């Protein structure tokens, strides 16, 4: 079996264009969580 290059070595593989539409991180698109959602996130994190 031939050794395969890691994804971060392949040129452009980390670009959002390669990963499909909407893969880029949009900073101003953050929505503020309500208190209930925040509590739910804490529960989910402990379950992982």
From Swiss-Prot:
* Segments of skewed composition (Basic and acidic residues): 28-40
Major location category of this protein: other
Q: Which keywords does this Swiss-Prot/TrEMBL entry list? A: Sporulation
What domain of life? Bacteria
Q: Name one GO biological process term.
A: sporulation resulting in formation of a cellular spore
* Keyword Transferase on entry: no
**Entry's localization field:** Spore core
Q: Which GO terms describe its cellular component?
A: endospore-forming forespore
Q: Where is this region: Disordered?
A: 1-48
Q: What induces it?
A: Expressed only in the forespore compartment of sporulating cells.
What family does this belong to?
Belongs to the SspO family.
| HAMAP family according to UniProt | SspO
What is the recorded name of this protein? Small, acid-soluble spore protein O
From which source organism is this entry? Bacillus licheniformis (strain ATCC 14580 / DSM 13 / JCM 2505 / CCUG 7422 / NBRC 12200 / NCIMB 9375 / NCTC 10341 / NRRL NRS-1264 / Gibson 46)
Which gene produces this protein? sspO
């Amino acid at each position: 079996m031939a050794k395969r290059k890691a994804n971060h070595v392949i040129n452009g593989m980390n670009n959002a264009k390669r990963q499909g539409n909407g893969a880029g991180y949009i900073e101003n698109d953050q929505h503020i969580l309500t208190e209930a959602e925040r509590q739910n996130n804490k529960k989910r994190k402990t379950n992982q």
